[in-house]
Regions:
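Conserved, structured core segments of small domains
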Residues: 1-86
Length: 86
């Protein structure tokens, strides 16, 4: 049984590097082929939210750890939480 996760992140103040990394970030998440993927930036572009399903906490954490935004140090903060929508 898969679990649902929410990945909430806030961008660092480096708009040029963020803009240059967006295509790799999007390709990363689409390339994972995760069930239930839904994601995108906040309207003010200060961060974003991604929801998805994973088999366990480790699979979800790996998806976040390999996100180019994380690897390039472009996030001020981020949270990964199991999510139970009602």
């Amino acid at each position: 049984m898969s679990l649902r996760f929410a990945y909430f992140y806030l961008m660092a103040d480096d708009p040029d590097r963020v803009r240059a990394t967006v295509p790799r970030h999007v390709a990363h998440w689409h390339g994972l082929g995760l069930t239930g993927y839904l994601g995108g930036p906040f309207a003010d572009r200060t961060g974003g939210l991604i929801t998805f399903q994973a088999d366990d906490d480790q699979q979800a954490q790996h998806a976040v750890d390999t996100d180019p935004f994380v690897q390039e140090g472009l996030l001020k903060a981020y949270w990964l939480k199991q999510w139970t929508p009602e």
